[in-house]
């Protein structure tokens, strides 16, 4: 199990996870999964009612398949950055969906692909080692692109996976009903899926249906995270990722795609560097 592999609660607190920025040499921190929860999520979770389910669902797919946008839609908040560039996600990002009857921990992974670089190989290895540590896998395939070699490459990998696999046809709003039906048939022919669900994260269509399907594959379990926690990403990592998202979207030609951001220090917004309070509307970070 890698540092980013999910773990279930053990009851012992651990230090917060570190940022995973390969270009900067940082390694992913411990994350939640079948053995224990570390970092901010190590705090005691509330007691579960009878019949409660909790567990982990991993979103996989080729780069730019809509995994991060879908993660944000299910959580109902921005926990993963998105951009028009493939391979924006560089480490496993966890978002928590809270319901009265279940707690679903989503693991958004980097895109799986045939690697051409060392970074690409590392990202693939990270995804594959995560697959065996979750309760259900969701393969994301966009509706507006024909099923191709990359999808078949991943489908063959997932055929050997232990957890059940749900096929998710993303970006359903981008095609006609006729084209969506054709894509659903093509995806069905790719493998033996536990379920097939078309969704539109942008319009919020079928999001509740997908959540119900994923929850149905979770084991009975008490909550793994406190009720007010939607991610276990440290604050510094979240800030760094938001900066990287803005750079990838707004400075496309001037910056390399293999951009990494490391936050060295976060100043108290109510004080300046000398310790005196900042007056007016100015804030420093």
Identify the role of each PLM range.
Residues 235-285:
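P-loop NTP-binding site
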Residues 61-62, 108-111, 141, 169, ...:
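Flexible glycine-/small-residue-rich
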Residues 86-88, 110-113, 143-147, 172-175, ...:
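Conserved nucleotide-binding/hydrolysis micro-motifs of P-loop NTPases
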